[in-house]
Amino acid sequence: MYSIKMRASKNGKHISGAERIVNKDEIEDVARELIKRALTHENGTPDFINIKIEEIKEDIEYIDHLPIKTIHCKNKEEAREKAREILRNEGIPDKVIDYAYEIIDKGGMRGAAILNLKGERLEPDKERGVRVKNIDTTKELKEKILKEKLGTERTVDAIAIASKVIHLGVIAELCTSDNKSYTTGYVATKRGYFRITNLKKEGESGGRVFFVKNDVNIEDLIDKLENKPFIIK
């Protein structure tokens, strides 16, 4: 199996990224698909596209996806309160949730911020954040999500990230999309992947925050988030 990663930017600013895990005979078609995705992204036409293809030599772990649930909210205020309620149920203090919203509102990070329950930021590079890599979903899961209208193409990408993150011991994830027209965000916990409509306003940037225990081994967690291969089924 091979990992194909795409990253696109303009004037040094991140525009889009995606990843697939494929068989050797799928590499050419999937690479072409990811290049097209980069060139047609709503955030703009990139002046730099990087495609990285490498063989996966480590055993790939197959895990079940988190249960998908959708919560419909009328506006951002209602949606944020619903997300807060889910996070509170996992023992995350309000002041830490407030800080997470500040990070997301600021925008501009390629990866995720990591907060412990004291509200301390643990990612080594506060500008870059931590990227969850070496992940994909099975074709069957993608078809199920789209056919049963459990979500969109963006949900397919997000459920892969969320399922891996929670499996590795992260308490919860809070995320809104970089796509300025896509206003549905999510909270992921061991209880499920909660899609929340109107978690941001149209035109706003997005962001991602992982909430972890105070005694987390942060170096080990980041290594697994970035390098351990998972396929979500």
Curated annotation (Swiss-Prot):
GO terms for biological process: biotin biosynthetic process. It comes from the Archaea. Its cofactor is Mg(2+). GO terms for molecular function: 6-carboxyhexanoate-CoA ligase activity; ATP binding; magnesium ion binding. Pathway: Metabolic intermediate metabolism; pimeloyl-CoA biosynthesis; pimeloyl-CoA from pimelate: step 1/1. Its EC number is 6.2.1.14. Catalyzes the transformation of pimelate into pimeloyl-CoA with concomitant hydrolysis of ATP to AMP. NCBIfam families: bioW, PRK01322.1. Belongs to the BioW family. Homodimer. This is 6-carboxyhexanoate--CoA ligase. It comes from Methanocaldococcus sp. (strain FS406-22). The lineage of its organism: Archaea, Methanobacteriati, Methanobacteriota, Methanomada group, Methanococci.
